[in-house]
């Protein structure tokens, strides 16, 4: 948004909760010249102020309640199916924050089925962080009849949302496709993120909930052996580099309830090795790494 505004010679405004957005993301809006305001509240508090702002000032809203944004996000599903030769996977798994992506992907799937581009619908499942799980609780506790806003708390900042704007749309998608909703812990997110990185892809923490959620859906028998699954990664690795560095350094969970259990993640940690400027030391480190990974 800020980049397009800069190219179009328009003013842009970004409201974010103070101290709760990674600097990797914040750097983009700053560099593109947006008026970036850090409010002393959470994400949902920012949304409340933004909703009031558009009533009083000629401001065009570009968050996930904007229907044009949903239409744009639909293209992810269209490209996905095109690349698969219009043969749908059995499952598509999406991170759940404000629920715009899941709503958009679901809308695209339903429209492609109506246009007979695909013969059947994949099951679309939504994964939330345990500390930011209002949609999960809505489905599990109330059958989707209502949602209870909460104070969200997760290191996966992109889905740290306690009152998702698109929950009703996401619920319709869940019901139409026969998908599931699941929640994952902070440690499960960190482990899944490291596994995705080790595969040469990389993503921000919020995206890694999809792999962590897939593991739970497999354990429950919802995803069966031999079924095809597509995990949607919505954010680049460099959007939250601090998380990655702290994880591999081994202090991501220091002082948290996960500190003791985080020892199980050590095999996934790849901290930099400090050596003398000596060829022999480098060769020894290389050979040790080869033995470890063989």
Regions found by a protein language model. Name each.
Residues 10-46:
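A glycine-rich helix N-cap at a beta->alpha junction
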Residues 12, 36, 60-61, 181:
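Hydrophobic beta-strand scaffold residues
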Residues 186-242:
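Claisen-condensing/thiolase-fold acyl-transfer catalytic domains that form or cleave C-C bonds
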Residues 41-58, 68, 111-203, 247-294:
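Active-site/ligand-binding loops adjacent to catalytic centers
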Residues 56, 84-88, 223-224:
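Glycine-rich phosphate-binding loop signature in dinucleotide/nucleotide-binding domains
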Residues 59-60, 90, 124, 227:
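Conserved acidic residues
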């Amino acid at each position: 948004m800020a980049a397009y505004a800069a190219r179009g010679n328009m003013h842009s405004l970004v409201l974010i909760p103070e101290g709760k957005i990674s600097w990797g993301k914040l750097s983009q809006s700053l560099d593109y010249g947006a008026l970036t305001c850090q409010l002393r509240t959470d994400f949902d508090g920012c949304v409340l102020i933004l909703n009031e702002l558009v009533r009083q000032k000629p401001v065009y809203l570009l968050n996930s309640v904007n229907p044009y944004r949903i239409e744009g996000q639909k293209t992810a599903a269209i490209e996905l199916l095109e690349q698969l030769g219009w043969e749908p996977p059995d499952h598509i798994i999406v991170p759940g924050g404000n629920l715009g992506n899941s709503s958009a992907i679901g809308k695209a799937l339903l429209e492609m089925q109506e246009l007979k581009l695909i013969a059947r619908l994949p099951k679309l499942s939504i994964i939330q962080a345990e500390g930011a799980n209002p949609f999960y609780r809505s489905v599990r506790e109330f059958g989707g009849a209502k949602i209870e806003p909460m104070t969200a708390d997760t290191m996966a900042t992109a889905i740290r949302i306690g009152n998702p704007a698109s929950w009703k749309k996401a619920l319709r998608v869940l019901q139409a496709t026969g998908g599931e909703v699941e929640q994952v812990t902070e440690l499960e997110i960190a482990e899944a993120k490291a596994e995705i990185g080790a595969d040469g892809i990389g993503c921000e923490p919020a995206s890694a909930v999809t792999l962590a959620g897939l593991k739970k859906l497999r354990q429950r028998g919802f995803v069966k052996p031999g079924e095809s699954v597509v995990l949607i990664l919505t954010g680049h690795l460099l959007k939250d580099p601090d998380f990655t560095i702290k994880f591999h350094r081994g202090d991501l969970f220091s002082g948290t309830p996960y500190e003791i259990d985080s020892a199980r993640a050590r095999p996934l940690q790849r901290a930099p090795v400090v050596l003398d400027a000596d060829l022999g030391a480098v060769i020894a480190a290389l050979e040790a790494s080869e033995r470890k990974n063989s």
